Each structure stands twice: as structure tokens, then as C-alpha cells.
């Protein structure tokens, strides 16, 4: 162990770790839970420190030697080699101060170590005076939240969603001529094609992509420069413009200064809104997964209209059983996302006066949702949707037995007579044709001329 110190005194930290006193105190007083601060946030904080050092250097607020030491240390950390030096949990102060200081301490000590100095000496690089210069945890942490959210959405979620949509589009084309019975209220309705049904799924996902894309607009606004409460105390003139410019280069994202720093620190409406769009996606995915599970139910005593890919045995007691495992896993992910949304909504209400104090749990839940959805969508696409096959015989049988084909006769016979045909066929276990002819409404030839399932599906969804 070695001694580190802060304003409250001496703290013992492991000799082989680069963090300092404030991180050590946080480990002692917030030792519960297994939910570590996401590395996406840690790396976003490191990027901010790198860009802040450059901006401070440009403005003459930080000498070139210290600037270069800080930048070099951040580059090493961003390689992933030092991830073990960021041990703190999400459960800490609601501003994320402990994690901000964890990053400051590791950068400072790594810079000192690389130049032959003594760990914990805070010389020549001080975690507060130099690494945290022109910053506050209150503006740095929300900035990191937005950076991590944008990069995770664009880097993993959107590509996974686009991939799933592409796979569903391919299935819509493959199933374009497979006529099936539609269902409303879980009951038989008029015919459609399986391709049309899949086109509806595709449209849902397309709309989700648009909503998620729109939600990025406000996530591009960064709080950096607001410092403690939004007034910008201790921020040199020109710092905001320069640090944003460097962050744009570092991330490749079109970040801009917050339109109002008091709002940027005291609320997280942009993240609440963005996660809302993820919740809509979760709702759409549950609908799609549930539909496909029902369509393949059976295989002999359910609907059995599609065949699932045979990925693994489905039961430890019933031999030969194949279950929609990917569908169920996806629905559990969506359940978690919907639960996260409730957590984020409540946490979003805790903007007490000038500072929201539930920042860590907001971004933890947000990133968990993004990562789970991205992984689950790819797995669902590759190991489930890609392998779906049509049970053509079952589709045809269900179409031929459906009573709702009588809807095609409504323009000819009227609603009341058609109702009599359907009810007679149901109660007497007759075909629609048999019931219609026995009632004397049409001949067999006339019935066949009007009831043609292939002409009842229209062209929608096949454009």
C-alpha cells in the first residue's frame, strides 16, 4: 500500500494502482453493489480531459509540458490498457464526482510515473489544478454522458437495428406470395401475405430508426463550460469553443455547446427523451417477437405456420422440442429496457435547483439498454429471423378453412346474408361454399368466382 492524501488527510491505496485518495475513499464508503461505472463513461471522461488540456494549452492557461504530459497519459488510457484502474461503482454521489476524480487521479499519476516522478506527489501534474482545469464534475460528467450515449447509439444500436430491418426486408420479399389468414383480437380475419405481415414489422423498425435519429439532436449539446452551476465560473474566455472543437475532432461527432448551461446541468431531458425512443423500439421488438412465436407455435397443435431454426434442444425432459429461444431472450431484454425507462424517468425528475443528482444511474441504465438491445437484435436477426421457413401446407389449409373469406361476398350479398353463411358453416362444420349453396344464396360456380383468396390480399406491402 502507499499513502495518498486529499483535503481530509491520508488514504492508503494499493501500490500497483494509479488512482488516489478520493477514489480510495469512494471504495471505502460505497463498497456495495456490482454495477461498475461503464467504461464508455470512463473513456468519455478521459477524452474530455485530453481536449480540455489542449484547449487550456492553446489559451495559455496550461504550460506546454503539462499539456503534453496529460495528453500522452490520456492516449495511453484510451488504448484500454489501464481499465482496471477505474474500480468505482455507479452508486456514488449523484453528480459523478468520485468517477471524475478517479479519472483525474489516474491521468495525473500516469503522467507523473511516465516522467519518473513519485505517485501521489501531485507534481508536476495535479489532478485538480491541471487535469481538471477549467472544469467541474457538474459539467464534465453530463458532457461524458452525452458523448457516451451518442457514440453507443451510433456505434452499436443503429447498425444492429439496420441489420435486423435488412433481414426482415429480405424475409418480406421471400414470403411475398405466401397467402395466410390475418388475425385481429387473436381471431381469424381476412387473408394477407406473410410478406405483408413482415412489411409491417419493417415499417415499425424504420420508424424507430427515425425516432432514435431525431433524439440525437439534443444529445449533441454538451454541458462543458457550465462548471459548478451553469454560470461558467473559472472558465477562461474562448475555452468552450476550443474544447468543443477538439471534442468534435476526437469523437467525429457534431457536438455543440449547450444552448443553456443552467438547463444542461440541472436536467437530463435529452437522455429521458432518447431513452423513450429506445422504449418504443422495445415495444416494437416485443410485438414482432411475440407474433413470430405464435406463428410458429405447435408444431402440430398450434398455429404452425412457420418453422423455427433448430438452434438447440428446447427441453430437458421432452425430447425433440424446439423453442423460440431467441424470441424469448429478446423479450426479456425489452422488459429490462422498459424497466430502465421507468428508472430514467424518475431519475430525470431529480434536478434539484441547479443540479440533477442521479446522473450515474441515468447513464448506467441508458447504456445498458443500448448494449442489450444492440446485442439482442443482432442475435435475433442472425439466429432466428434468418432461419425462418414457411409451412406452406399449413398456411393453405388455414386459408381454406377460414370463415372470414366470406367478407369477399359482402359487396354481393350484403353483411346480413354473409353473417348467416359464416354462422351456419361454423355451427354445422361446413365449408363456406357448402353453407352458401345450402342457403340458396349462390351456386358453387358463383361462389368460386367471388371468393378468391389471392385477390383479397391487395398490393400493399409489396411495392
From Swiss-Prot:
The record marks 328 as: Important for catalytic activity. The active site is at residues 185, 315. Keywords: Cytoplasm, Lyase, Tricarboxylic acid cycle. One of its GO terms (cellular component) is cytoplasm. Disulfide bonds: none annotated. Its main location: cytoplasm. GO terms for biological process: fumarate metabolic process; malate metabolic process; tricarboxylic acid cycle. Pfam families: FumaraseC_C, Lyase_1. It is an enzyme of class 4 (lyase). It is found in: Cytoplasm. Its EC number is 4.2.1.2. GO terms for molecular function: fumarate hydratase activity. Pathway: Carbohydrate metabolism; tricarboxylic acid cycle; (S)-malate from fumarate: step 1/1. PROSITE patterns: FUMARATE_LYASES (PS00163). The keyword Cytoplasm applies. There are 2 substrate-binding sites: the catalytic A site, and the non-catalytic B site that may play a role in the transfer of substrate or product between the active site and the solvent. Alternatively, the B site may bind allosteric effectors. Involved in the TCA cycle. Catalyzes the stereospecific interconversion of fumarate to L-malate. PANTHER family: ASPARTATEAMMONIA/ARGININOSUCCINATE/ADENYLOSUCCINATE LYASE (PTHR11444), FUMARATE HYDRATASE, MITOCHONDRIAL (PTHR11444:SF1). Belongs to the class-II fumarase/aspartase family. Fumarase subfamily. This is Fumarate hydratase class II.
Amino acid at each position: 500500500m502507499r499513502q495518498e492524501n486529499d483535503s481530509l488527510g491520508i488514504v492508503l491505496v494499493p501500490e500497483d494502482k494509479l488512482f488516489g485518495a478520493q477514489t480510495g475513499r469512494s471504495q471505502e464508503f460505497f463498497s456495495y453493489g456490482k454495477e461498475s461505472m461503464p467504461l464508455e463513461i470512463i473513456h468519455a471522461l478521459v477524452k474530455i480531459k485530453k481536449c480540455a488540456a489542449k484547449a487550456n494549452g492553446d489559451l495559455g492557461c496550461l504550460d506546454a509540458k503539462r499539456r503534453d504530459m496529460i495528453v500522452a497519459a490520456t492516449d495511453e488510457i484510451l488504448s484500454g490498457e489501464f481499465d482496471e484502474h477505474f474500480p468505482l461503482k455507479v452508486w456514488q454521489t449523484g453528480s459523478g464526482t468520485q468517477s471524475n476524480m478517479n479519472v483525474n487521479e489516474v491521468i495525473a499519476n500516469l503522467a507523473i510515473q511516465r516522467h519518473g516522478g513519485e505517485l501521489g506527489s501531485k507534481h508536476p501534474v495535479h489532478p485538480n489544478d491541471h487535469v481538471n482545469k477549467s472544469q467541474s464534475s457538474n459539467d464534465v460528467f453530463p458532457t461524458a454522458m452525452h458523448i457516451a450515449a451518442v457514440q453507443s447509439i451510433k456505434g452499436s444500436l443503429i447498425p444492429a437495428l439496420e441489420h435486423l430491418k435488412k433481414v426482415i426486408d429480405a424475409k418480406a420479399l421471400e414470403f411475398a406470395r405466401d397467402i395466410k389468414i390475418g388475425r385481429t383480437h387473436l381471431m381469424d380475419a381476412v387473408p394477407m401475405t406473410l410478406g405483408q405481415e413482415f412489411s409491417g414489422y419493417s415499417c415499425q423498425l424504420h420508424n424507430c430508426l427515425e425516432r432514435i435519429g431525431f433524439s440525437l439532436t439534443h444529445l449533441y449539446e454538451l454541458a462543458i463550460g457550465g462548471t459548478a452551476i451553469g454560470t461558467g465560473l473559472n472558465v477562461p474566455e474562448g475555452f468552450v469553443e476550443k474544447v468543443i472543437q477538439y471534442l468534435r475532432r476526437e469523437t467525429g461527432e457534431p457536438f455543440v455547446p449547450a444552448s443553456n448551461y443552467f438547463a444542461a446541468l440541472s436536467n437530463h431531458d435529452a437522455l429521458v427523451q432518447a431513452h423513450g425512443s429506445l422504449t418504443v423500439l422495445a415495444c416494437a421488438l416485443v410485438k414482432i417477437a411475440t407474433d413470430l412465436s405464435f406463428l410458429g407455435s405447435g408444431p402440430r397443435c398450434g398455429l404452425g405456420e412457420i418453422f423455427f431454426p433448430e438452434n438447440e434442444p428446447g427441453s430437458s425432459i421432452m425430447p425433440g422440442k424446439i423453442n423460440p429461444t431467441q424470441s424469448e431472450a429478446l423479450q426479456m431484454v425489452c422488459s429490462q429496457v422498459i424497466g430502465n425507462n421507468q428508472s430514467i424517468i424518475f431519475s430525470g425528475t431529480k434536478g434539484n435547483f441547479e443540479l440533477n443528482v442521479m446522473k450515474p444511474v441515468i447513464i448506467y441504465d441508458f447504456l445498458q439498454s443500448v448494449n442489450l438491445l444492440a446485442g439482442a437484435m443482432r442475435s435475433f436477426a442472425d439466429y432466428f429471423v434468418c432461419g425462418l421457413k414457411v409451412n406452406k401446407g399449413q398456411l393453405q389449409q388455414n386459408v381454406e378453412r377460414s370463415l372470414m373469406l366470406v367478407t369477399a361476398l359482402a359487396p354481393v350479398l350484403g353483411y346480413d346474408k354473409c353473417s348467416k353463411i359464416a354462422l351456419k358453416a361454423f355451427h354445422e362444420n361446413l365449408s363456406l361454399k357448402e353453407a352458401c349453396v345450402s342457403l340458396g344464396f349462390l351456386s358453387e360456380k358463383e361462389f368460386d368466382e367471388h371468393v378468391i383468396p389471392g385477390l383479397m390480399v391487395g398490393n400493399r406491402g409489396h411495392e
